[in-house]
Amino acid sequence: MVYVLSRSVAIALTGGRRAVLRPLGVAAAALAATGYVAVVDPNAAGHYPTCPFLAITGWYCPGCGALRAVHALAHGDLMTALARNPFAVVALGYLVVAWVLWLHRTATGRPRRWLAPPWVLYSALGAILMFWVLRNVPGWTWLSPA
């Protein structure tokens, strides 16, 4: 049995100080990648590879336009980001919230919860599939990244 005298001791016992390095490392990598996308414009030809799904089928995948959306967000242009890939903008917001919760749980020594409940995962999968289909249907061109 472990007796905990204070919260700081609890963090030390659970490895909280070292464990916090993981979410901070993920944040550093995400910020570095965002910085690169902010500097190297994905709207200019030749900087990034073409989407293989788009190249093979001629249809947009759910990720098409995500780099351009991140580029626009990095420059503070929310409307352009939403025009390029609205799903990516919403997903990035969710990832930021999930990261904050991960950091908080790690810093306070609470156990990690990696998976959401099944209904959330199935709903997300359904939303991705629906977005994928609708952005390629005539009349829904406002979802295309062009």
Language-model regions: role of each:
Residues 1-26:
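Polybasic, low-complexity association/targeting segments
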Residues 31-38, 128-136:
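Aromatic-anchored segments of alpha-helical transmembrane domains
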Residues 132-146:
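Juxtamembrane boundary at the C-terminal end of a transmembrane helix
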Residues 47-52, 81-86, 113-116, 143-146:
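Non-cytosolic membrane-interface motifs at loop->transmembrane helix junctions
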Residues 45-83:
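Extracytosolic (periplasmic/ER-lumenal) interhelical loops and adjacent juxtamembrane/interface segments
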